[in-house]
């Protein structure tokens, strides 16, 4: 017997991708309902070879439904997720609302799949921030071999992380560079994104870090190990899809780069492409269309006794099928 599945936010990029992946993976769903806000009521969305007509999230009765995939913002999640959970539907939430709630598991399947068993406290499972998700997939297998002491990460995050408006702004500004009659001032981003990089994602905190950077610290501790020290610098780059990260890892004891490479080759959700030659690494272009976290440039850090440097890339399309959808297929729930 299959599940009855709800996708809330079905007309957005993430919601549509959820429906695509549910169909592609042949998830055992007997029935799928597509929900949207009142202004999108009646919109048609694709689910495999079927067409679903969206229903009103505000009036939907979650009773008798098994799983609700929430691809709406924190405000809507706060209003509707408790309603769904109280009706007995397991909510799997993409927003940041429940990530730091001690009674809600924060799950990356390749890293802490067992944590999903804690969903019953509130009937809610949270999904981490995109930049955290790809990093912990790389960190966890290494941490299991030799405990990690400290992580320094710099991100190169595509405009898809800012949604369709961010992608449109990059496209429009790029065209405007070559057509001076077009005046495309920044709207979604605080500064020009075309042919530029912006060291600012989300709002600024009192200590000078941004909320995106704070998320990476807090979520890594919750998912992997509270004892790991993490410092992050998150940067928006003029790439349409695909997030990348430069990660420096300091271990408690020595870990050889060859052993680290072997560990990562065997790790779930990881694809190692690491040749010390021109083109022997992965960029966001190559990562597009695949659900793996690609890792390259694995090498010792000669400035500390127990350090490793690496580069990782992950497809991300607001968010990627892997982050936003695959981690929402709760086989244990």
Regions found by a protein language model. Give the residues of each.
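Conserved small/polar residues in nucleotide/adenosyl-binding loops
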Residues: 316-321
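Helix N-cap motif at beta-to-alpha junctions
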Residues: 251-254
